[in-house]
């Protein structure tokens, strides 16, 4: 026998149970056109007639020339072949996808592949949710993705929290029964059941034998103001024999009695401000309660008549008696009233939805659209559901009566009515957290059969059990959101995502049929939760119109004419504009747009245009000409198409271009990465043949700056765009070219007010505080270095070093560098691809590129020398102080990423994001993250909302996306106020890419990929509201910066003022004058005169020395003062001992003594206060050094 070793099980990881399958390609040169998720593996890849098609274990991806289809496999309802060459794919959310093939054989082959991929699973592990969770959990901390797996604390402790929130009297009136522990009574009910306190478990067992599926009447909601409760159950099993059950009748009437014994705040004289109730009715109830309050609980008035709401029609209820069911008889249930709502069963709803899908898949503009939509009866079914919920809400709120809701089995129409009524009654369920609790408690805990209704239950072939019940309920919530847009914390995108993942099987939330099955299969621990994606801290799903203080009871209009078709789900392609296509021109006129973006700061320079056609600008056959200035850059690129074709799927069949790096590096395959972005004004001026205007004459403070900046740094500060070329390893101009540019800078033309003395003083103060020692190590690609070592340049904008960029812009743009900081440099290792308006793709060679941009290839060796001498330097950032660059360039958290959703140019808190490719990916893949963002933290894929081109294409062997460097707040503003970011998780391997233009509308619908790998739902209204909010935050931040700059300017003025005259003793002279006879200057030596003489030598006293820092209370701070991340159990609050504000641990982790606060030991301070204290100490030391020679000379 061989050597004995440890058991092999110790070496098995969870992801090893789900190994990726081998990829089958129809052509060897094809590459996967999307970025896979954790555990996702592409199994088939080939070409259709006009598209690229791929099937993974999670999704079907079809890349057309002008669109992309991205559908999870479990969302596909049926696949069939039509017209011999066409695949007709029907989805469970009513979408219909058609894909054409060139041959009948190929069509049948892909039909067979897709049919096998979408077949019912043989075992639960065949669902992708298990593989996704296993691959999200790695052995190392870097591979952990637990934030994608676990729900929040409000989900785990929802039952206890709900009982406390609704104010149940668990001592005298109600009790929590554990009769269903381990699901021994009813597998489709939760383990804890709320019943009246005098109902015993034996009676509950007897009632369970009388109710269908043992689903007994239990209470699920209590109205806080009047104590009325909502209960739910299934139908009674009366059958044709007319069976009765005394315990069931007693339990139903006991619910009404318990509500009378546990009145709400109205009966006890509490607040009456909730809802739209009649004032006289509230006063009468309060008066009646005051008469009986002294006599105790026993003297409470008779219980209200309980309403039994049967969701079925009376005919259907009676017909169910033949199957052993039935309905309650009012004669047997005293003090009860039975009402039938006439809601259709699941078979009618399924047929209606199929008709709706057929209507939505017709031609875009059918002549009979309205009549066809009416014939589906989908809106009619929604109307009946809303009417039932409104009846329950009015009965509870206005009449104060308890309600018992049931249908046949109690797991389809019953949760629809109960959950919708709770949304109408309780504003908590209209919040993000409350809505999640509502879905968990009323749908999942009470056994809605998601596995059967959604069609992903294993070994079930009966299609009659499939029905979009939950989708229909979400549609009704969408109708409420349309009618009450200010009363819901979540937006439409939240509901659309919930629809997608009800069927996607990416998360385990909606797997299995009841909680008993989920617990037996350990689904909660083996799969991720959808609430991790739809968490409350994700600002992508926040409704910016939400009014949190409103507690109004909703009374919606339920008529069919007031309802709307949910186009975001049923007709997603009908939306008039996507976020990738829309820009500020949709909302603002050209004049208003200019004022919106350039007028927020009085000293911001307007953006100018240097060429009419960016496409012809890249053509060397046409000379570069300068045109008149125009601040509206977006208006001149309307006809440009965004090239979204991957490099491997050129429709013309052109070969992949190989470009020589120019410095002896290996050749790299470059894909079709679209058109070059619109260049900012200064970069266009640099590329044009016209000279620049000089800034040196705008203010005498420029000379002061020149004297303060070291010579080595002054060579890098001639222009923002030139500086960026030097930062990102592109060939830099030689010193002679820079001198020429410096002599010809007069073309820009800036008013004198744009170069105030404050900028010089501010920049000088930064030079003094930095001592020119905080240098940023910018990552470079080793293959572009002549010596094979990484080159590093110095981005001045990340230091406190002044440059002409500071003079070109206002004080506010010191922290918001121009878009050139994000523009891709002209790099010899990048093949620039251009596409003319007709759609043909042309490749511009390396030599043609450089010929149109003269004097850019000189001085590369000089850059390499300067870059290599800066290794190991520290980065001095106003937010973090001095620290190694690696600590600053770090991936941000998931909660921080959610802050940047569709904020345009106003991303006010950004420290760094990471984009890489999953481990094991051996081939370059195109990251279709045009506008939105998905993230895989810790060396996995991360995408940020907004235009993000960080991974348009990449090579595993060193081709990464360039890092976007910026100053303190770290965001980069592109032309027209849009953002562009390039992200990399490997700072030492960076290469340039050519992004797609940001502001050019495209007929190609872009992909907004989220954490789930699916397109992000677009909402132009919420997008505009985010822009408005972000603009407000930016204005506030600019005002804060201006205040800080003004304070620093005043401090420097006091610090740099000439020293006062040394104090001398004039007391003898004054005494002589005072004692002399006939002196008229007797008052000259008074105390007032002495004060006037010595006033100039007084040191300024800071107000903080006489004030006590008051801390912001914990309950008033829900978000970090700096990064605006939300506090929760794992993100605690930290007070800064200097300013008193509340921060998270990342923004408040440094310690310093604060003598001004009598804190002589190091205490916790925020990053900004840390820097301020450090600067103040350095200024005090400098002042002391200046006073020493003066005191020596005077002595």
Curated annotation (Swiss-Prot):
Q: Which residue ranges are recorded for the region named Disordered?
A: 645-756, 780-800, 827-877
EC number, UniProt record: 3.1.3.95
Give the reactions, separated by semicolons, that this protein catalyses: a 1,2-diacyl-sn-glycero-3-phospho-(1D-myo-inositol-3-phosphate) + H2O = a 1,2-diacyl-sn-glycero-3-phospho-(1D-myo-inositol) + phosphate; a 1,2-diacyl-sn-glycero-3-phospho-(1D-myo-inositol-3,5-bisphosphate) + H2O = a 1,2-diacyl-sn-glycero-3-phospho-(1D-myo-inositol-5-phosphate) + phosphate; 1,2-dioctanoyl-sn-glycero-3-phospho-(1-D-myo-inositol-3-phosphate) + H2O = 1,2-dioctanoyl-sn-glycero-3-phospho-(1D-myo-inositol) + phosphate; 1,2-dioctanoyl-sn-glycero-3-phospho-(1D-myo-inositol-3,5-bisphosphate) + H2O = 1,2-dioctanoyl-sn-glycero-3-phospho-(1D-myo-inositol-5-phosphate) + phosphate
Q: Which GO terms describe its molecular function?
A: molecular adaptor activity; phosphatidylinositol-3,5-bisphosphate 3-phosphatase activity; phosphatidylinositol-3-phosphate phosphatase activity; protein phosphatase binding; protein serine/threonine phosphatase activity; protein tyrosine phosphatase activity; R-SMAD binding; zinc ion binding
Ranges of residues in domain Myotubularin phosphatase: 153-570
Q: Which residues carry this modification: Phosphoserine?
A: 8, 610, 629
Q: Which family does it belong to?
A: Belongs to the protein-tyrosine phosphatase family. Non-receptor class myotubularin subfamily.
Q: What is this protein called?
A: Phosphatidylinositol-3,5-bisphosphate 3-phosphatase MTMR4
């Amino acid at each position: 026998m061989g050597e004995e070793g440890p058991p092999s099980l110790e070496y098995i990881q969870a992801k090893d149970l789900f190994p990726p399958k081998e990829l089958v390609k129809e052509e060897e040169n094809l590459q996967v056109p999307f970025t896979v998720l954790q555990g996702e593996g592409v199994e088939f890849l080939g070409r259709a007639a006009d598209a690229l098609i791929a099937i993974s274990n999670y999704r079907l991806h079809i890349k057309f020339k002008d669109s992309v289809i991205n559908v999870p496999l479990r969302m596909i309802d049926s696949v069939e072949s039509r017209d011999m060459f066409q695949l007709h794919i029907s989805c469970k959310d009513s979408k219909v996808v058609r894909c054409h093939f060139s041959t009948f054989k190929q069509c049948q082959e892909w039909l067979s592949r897709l049919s096998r991929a979408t077949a019912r699973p043989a075992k639960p592990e065949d669902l992708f949710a298990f593989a996704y969770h296993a691959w999200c959990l790695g052995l190392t901390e870097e591979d952990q993705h637990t934030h994608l797996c676990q729900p929040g604390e409000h989900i785990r402790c929802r039952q206890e929290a709900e009982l406390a929130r609704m104010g149940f009297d668990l001592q005298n009136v109600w009790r929590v029964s554990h009769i269903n522990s381990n699901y021994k009574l009813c597998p489709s009910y939760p383990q804890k059941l709320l019943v009246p306190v005098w109902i015993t478990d034996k009676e509950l067992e007897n009632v369970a034998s009388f109710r269908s599926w043992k689903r007994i009447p239990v209470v699920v909601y209590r109205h806080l103001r009047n104590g009325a409760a909502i209960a739910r159950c299934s139908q009674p099993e009366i059958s044709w024999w007319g069976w009765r059950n005394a315990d069931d009748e007693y339990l139903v009437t006991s619910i009404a009695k318990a509500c009378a014994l546990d009145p709400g705040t109205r009966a006890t004289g509490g607040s009456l401000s909730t809802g739209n109730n009649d004032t006289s009715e509230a006063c009468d109830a309060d008066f009646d309660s005051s008469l009986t309050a002294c006599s105790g609980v026993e003297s409470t008035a008779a219980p209200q008549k309980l309403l039994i709401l049967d969701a079925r029609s009376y005919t259907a209820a009676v017909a169910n008696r033949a199957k052993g069911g039935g309905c309650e008889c009012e004669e047997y249930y005293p003090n009860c009233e039975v009402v039938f709502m006439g809601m259709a069963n699941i078979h009618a709803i399924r047929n209606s939805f199929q008709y709706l899908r057929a209507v939505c898949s017709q031609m875009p503009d059918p002549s009979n659209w309205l009549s066809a939509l009416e014939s589906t009866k989908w809106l009619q079914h929604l109307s009946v559901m809303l009417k039932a919920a409104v009846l329950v809400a009015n009965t509870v709120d206005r009449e104060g009566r308890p309600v018992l809701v049931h249908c046949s089995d109690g797991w389809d129409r019953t949760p629809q009515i109960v959950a919708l009524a709770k949304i109408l009654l309780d504003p908590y369920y209209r919040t993000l957290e409350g809505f999640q609790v509502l879905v968990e408690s009323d749908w999942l805990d009470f056994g809605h059969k998601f596995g059967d209704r959604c069609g992903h239950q294993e070994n079930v072939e009966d299609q009659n059990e499939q029905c979009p019940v939950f989708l229909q309920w979400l549609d009704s919530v969408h109708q409420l959101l349309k009618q009450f847009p200010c009363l819901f914390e979540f937006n439409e995108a939240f509901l659309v995502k919930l629809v997608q993942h009800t069927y996607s099987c990416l998360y385990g939330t909606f797997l299995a049929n009841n909680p008993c099955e989920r617990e037996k299969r350990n689904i909660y621990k083996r799969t991720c939760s959808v609430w991790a994606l739809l968490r409350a801290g994700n600002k992508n799903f926040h409704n910016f119109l939400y009014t949190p203080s409103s507690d109004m009871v909703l009374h919606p209009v339920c008529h069919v004419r007031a309802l709307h078709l949910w186009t975001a789900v049923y007709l997603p392609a009908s939306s008039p504009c996507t976020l990738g296509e829309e820009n500020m021109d949709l909302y603002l006129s050209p004049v208003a747009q200019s004022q919106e973006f350039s007028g927020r700061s009085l000293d911001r320079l307007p953006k100018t245009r240097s060429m009419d056609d960016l496409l012809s600008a890249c053509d060397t056959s046409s000379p570069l000409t300068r045109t008149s200035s125009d601040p509206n850059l977006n208006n001149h690129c309307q006809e440009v198409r965004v090239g979204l074709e991957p490099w491997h799927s050129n429709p013309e069949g052109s070969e992949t271009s190989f470009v020589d790096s120019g410095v002896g590096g290996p050749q790299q395959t470059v894909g079709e990465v679209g058109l070059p972005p619109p260049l900012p004004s200064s970069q266009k001026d640099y590329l044009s043949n016209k000279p620049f205007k000089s800034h040196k004459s705008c203010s005498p403070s420029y000379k002061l700056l020149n004297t303060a900046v070291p010579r080595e740094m002054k060579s890098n500060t001639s222009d923002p765009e030139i500086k960026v070329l030097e930062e990102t390893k592109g060939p830099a101009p030689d010193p002679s070219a820079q001198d020429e540019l410096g002599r010809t800078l007069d073309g820009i033309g800036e008013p004198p007010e744009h170069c105030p003395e404050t900028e010089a003083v501010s920049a000088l103060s930064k030079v003094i505080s930095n001592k020119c020692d905080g240098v940023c190590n910018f990552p470079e690609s080793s293959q572009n270095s002549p010596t094979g070592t990484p080159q590093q340049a110095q981005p001045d904008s990340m230091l406190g070093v002044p440059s002409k960029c500071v003079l070109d812009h206002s004080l506010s743009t010191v922290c918001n560098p121009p878009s050139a900081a994000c523009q891709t440099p002209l790099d010899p290792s990048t093949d620039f691809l251009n596409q003319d308006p007709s759609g043909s793709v042309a490749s511009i060679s390396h030599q043609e590129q450089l010929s149109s941009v003269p004097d850019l290839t000189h001085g590369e060796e000089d850059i390499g020398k300067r870059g290599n001498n800066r290794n190991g330097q520290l980065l001095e950032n106003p937010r973090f102080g001095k620290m190694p660059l690696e600590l600053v360039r770090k991936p941000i958290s998931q909660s921080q990423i959610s802050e940047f959703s569709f904020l345009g140019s106003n991303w006010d808190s950004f420290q760094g994001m990471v984009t890489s490719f999953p481990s094991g990916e051996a081939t370059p893949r195109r990251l279709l993250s045009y506008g939105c963002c998905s993230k895989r933290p810790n060396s996995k894929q991360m995408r940020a909302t907004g235009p993000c081109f960080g991974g348009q294409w990449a090579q595993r062997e060193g081709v990464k996306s360039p890092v976007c460097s910026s100053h303190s707040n770290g965001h980069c503003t592109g032309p027209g106020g849009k953002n562009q970011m390039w992200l990399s998780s490997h700072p030492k391997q960076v290469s340039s890419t050519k992004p797609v233009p940001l502001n050019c509308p495209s007929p190609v619908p872009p992909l907004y990929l989220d954490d789930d790998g699916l397109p992000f739902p677009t909402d132009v209204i919420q997008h505009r509201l985010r822009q408005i909010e972000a603009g407000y935050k930016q204005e506030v931040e600019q005002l804060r910066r201006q205040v800080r700059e003004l304070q620093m300017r005043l401090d420097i003025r006091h610090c740099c003022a000439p020293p006062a005259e040394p104090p001398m003793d004039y007391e003898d002279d004054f005494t002589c004058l005072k004692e002399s006879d006939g002196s008229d200057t007797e008052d000259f030596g008074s105390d007032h005169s002495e004060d006037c003489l010595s006033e100039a030598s007084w040191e300024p006293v800071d107000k903080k020395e006489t004030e006590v820092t008051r801390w912001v209370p914990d309950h008033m701070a829900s978000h970090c003062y700096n990064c605006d991340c939300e506090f929760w159990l794992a993100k605690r609050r930290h007070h800064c001992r200097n300013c008193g504000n509340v921060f998270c641990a990342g923004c408040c982790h440094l310690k310093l003594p604060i003598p001004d606060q009598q804190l002589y030991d190091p205490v916790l301070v925020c990053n900004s206060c840390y820097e301020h204290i450090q600067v103040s100490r350095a200024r005090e030391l400098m002042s002391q050094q200046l006073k020493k020679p003066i005191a020596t000379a005077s002595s």
